[in-house]
């Protein structure tokens, strides 16, 4: 998958290629995941929110210009954990 946009900079840049481990969908431990947020596929850092009812995650962009937000497990679909990326030099 190609990354689109600058919300995950400086970690991931626009047009980086990411390899997704679709067998790793649990946001524990925290990490960078590809998820479907109802509008499309996005790469974001996810953190499980302990003791949340219903279960929820904090969705975080590495770029500080984009604020973090929270979503319940029903509001997103985690595709998998990003394990590798490549960038053209």
Regions found by a protein language model. Name each.
Residues 1-89:
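Acidic/glycine-rich C-terminal interaction modules and beta/coil loop segments
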């Amino acid at each position: 998958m190609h990354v689109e946009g600058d919300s995950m900079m400086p970690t991931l840049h626009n047009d980086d290629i990411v390899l997704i481990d679709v067998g790793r969908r649990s946001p524990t431990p925290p990490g960078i995941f590809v998820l479907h947020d109802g509008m499309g596929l996005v790469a974001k850092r996810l953190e499980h929110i302990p003791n949340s009812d219903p279960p929820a995650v904090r969705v975080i962009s590495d770029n500080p210009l984009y604020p973090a937000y929270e979503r319940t497990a029903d509001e997103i679909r985690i595709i998998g954990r990003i394990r590798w990326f490549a960038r053209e030099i």
